């Protein structure tokens, strides 16, 4: 119920601003924890920011704008974030009954889709649903059955993102999450060979990026430190609605 919500906001603006306002709202009411490991800092966000960005773009682009009074809703709960927009699947099928890796791209609003493609907010090949899952599964604290879920009804499309740091008992202690992740890393260590296979990065490419001089190493360290502070900052311990 609306009266039970901690915060309720409505926006009327162009699509680019609506995307910004939506992301700001979600970031304000979700958390990104971290824990200091022996040799590094481990970030443990509730959600993948990029996956949620992809989801919000998907809902803004593919919603049915012929539905008068229709809106894109963002509902934030303790254990999940739900995005809802008017408009079911164009071919009349139910997305929950489909293999998302075999769903062809069908654009309800091609002009809007082209605009977002030009802004580099989406890809032309229509991989949004797959990308949301892949981005979530890459997080270190990902658990099975916590991948984004999609559902369609007669006139609506739903995307649900599950809080990776939450279970039936409430918020999972950050140390418990860190220990689980650390055990996984010990079982499946990341070495130079696996880094090359997955990311194309090795010691030579690192030297090429930052230089092999003390000044280059110091500069690279400084860049990494500033980037980390800018991206993660202090955790916001706010309530959600």
Identify the function of each model-found stretch.
Residues 1-241:
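C-terminal regulatory or interaction extensions
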């Amino acid at each position: 119920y609306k009266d039970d919500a901690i915060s309720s906001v409505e926006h009327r603006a162009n699509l680019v601003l609506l995307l910004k306002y939506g992301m700001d709202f979600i970031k304000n009411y979700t958390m990104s924890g971290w824990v200091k490991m022996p040799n590094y800092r481990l970030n443990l966000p509730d959600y993948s920011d990029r996956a949620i960005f992809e989801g919000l773009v998907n809902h803004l682009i593919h919603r049915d704008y012929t539905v008068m009074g229709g809106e894109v809703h963002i509902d934030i709960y303790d254990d999940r974030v739900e995005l809802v927009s008017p408009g079911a699947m164009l071919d009349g099928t139910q997305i929950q009954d489909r293999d998302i890796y075999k769903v062809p791209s069908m654009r309800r609003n091609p002009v809007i889709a082209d605009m977002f493609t030009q802004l580099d907010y989406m890809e032309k090949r229509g991989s949004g649903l797959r990308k949301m899952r892949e981005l979530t599964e890459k997080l270190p604290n990902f658990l099975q059955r916590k991948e984004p879920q999609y559902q369609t009804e007669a006139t609506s499309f739903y995307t649900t993102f599950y809080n990776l740091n939450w279970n039936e008992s409430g918020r999972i202690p950050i140390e418990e999450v860190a220990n689980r992740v650390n055990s996984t890393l010990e079982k499946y260590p990341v070495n130079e060979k696996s880094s090359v296979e997955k990311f194309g990065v090795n010691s030579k490419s690192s030297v090429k990026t930052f230089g092999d001089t003390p000044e280059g190493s110091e500069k690279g360290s400084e860049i990494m430190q500033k980037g980390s502070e800018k991206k993660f900052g202090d955790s916001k311990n706010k309530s959600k609605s």
